[in-house]
Amino acid sequence: MCGCERTPILVQSNRRDHDDNQIHKQSVRHRVHWRMCPNNRALRQPEFGTDALEHHCSEGFYAGACGYVGVEKDNGIVLMLPEYDLVVIGSGPAGQKAAIAAAKVRKNVAVIDRTPMIGGVSVHTGTIPSKTIREAIFQLTGRAVKAQYGNGHVAHGDISVRDVSVRVREIIERETDVVRVQLRRNGISIYQGLALFLDPHTLTVRDGEDGHQLKAKNILIACGTRPAHSPEIPFDDHRIVDTDHLHGLSGLPRETIVVGAGVVGLEYASFMAALGSRVTLVDQRPIILDFVDQEIVQALSYHLRQLGITFRLGEKVTRVSMDMQREFAFAELESGKKIQGDALVYAVGRQGNADHLHLEAAGLVADPRGRVKVNELFQTAVPHIYAAGDVIGFPALASTSMEQGRLAACHMFGIPFEHMPELFPYGIYTIPEISMVGQTEETLTSTKVPYEVGIARYSELAKSMMLGDHMGMLKLLFHRDTHKLLGVHALGQRATEIIHIGQAVLFYNGLVDYFRDMVFNYPTLAEAYKVAALNGLNRL
């Protein structure tokens, strides 16, 4: 049973004179502060003036050490507020890395998260769940095994949403434990509740009716995003859902409508199709993934159609509705078409959570999409307040968010650092997955760079045959005259893994000749680099 006590921070001021500049003697009634753990019990903070001691309840919610600052009220009561070198709003990838980087240089750090389960959107509704769903589908449906041993092989019987959800919950719990242990090990305090600015250095943390205040020398806004909602969409979290509430589906829909063909929409469309649902994907844009090399996009589109996905591109959804019995969802298109499905997944954009923080009290303002503007050092218009992660917009990747958070902490505490690299890989976890780093054919053509292409088909690689992947490919782009590597694009199994070989060569301005001249393990997918390099160099 949790033995934490609920004790407010109050210090009675014993005034000896009326000189405001006089340092007044204080008789301390309580020198601990409290906050709620998930079972509505509280956590005791280490005694005032102690070193980085720790306390945690049986549920694992953790309190580290901090300093205190006195704030005097009109009635003579001095409220002793916990004061931190850094308070991080959000415990996702950006918040985690910033908090740990600051703690490593002996700074007092606190993390505020509005949910009982730390880890942010990335762990609970975003990156980790979606990628776990993908891997669970591969395992439960036996897709890779069937490719190797034929359709007669069945790895699992009928696949249900429950089967997938069990695995997702297991991974989420493990990742949450990893984050909690990392923060605890580094002496970082964790607060549960909604963070609101009172002034540029003061935050209040509200958990239901309870609330308490924190002072911070530096603040990092890393509160992430949520699915964008249109007021015309009648969400019910069962038949019409956003991507954060797919778990609300009672079973696998026979027919699914996915509105939005961005990265998230494409990923979930491919997941549902791989499970056997007939998917219609609707987007008002004429093409998908316009930032990706279009040869890769065309190959991906072909394979998605092979999964059974129907594309309705260049079509705007004008109305979404349900029937009277709430058994079917309907999407009406501007062209007059009406699509029926057992479920509709709305995947049109994300909305930043900064619009819930009372930014105006800190002298800041969020844009209409709830995002915060920052400079190249991740500072907002108020220099001691930083922002990182999805809440600042593009590129909104878990990988880049981690580095943004770390760099923000480095700058605020004078830790030597390099600026955010311009070169980073994208991974899109559709079935099949794709990844890219560097330039595309379209950008090289528009900038009039003389380039050549080298391609390796997975069907040429022994390893891919063993894995049952006949459809993948690796594409290298390099300068015709200097042979400098310019871009790397991959489609197929482990594309998001092998892309990093190309990333390293690109970063060091390497030549495509490197792949030709190096010896790779055999059989491996990495061998595709040598095959693609030879293919491209033989075209010169």
What do these predicted ranges mean?
Residues L81-Y84, I100-L252, T280, R285-L289, ...:
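Glycine-rich flavin
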Residues D236-P253, K338-H411, I501, V505:
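FAD-site-proximal beta/loop scaffold in flavoenzymes
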Residues T7, S13, P38, A42, ...:
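Short linear motifs in low-complexity or flexible loops
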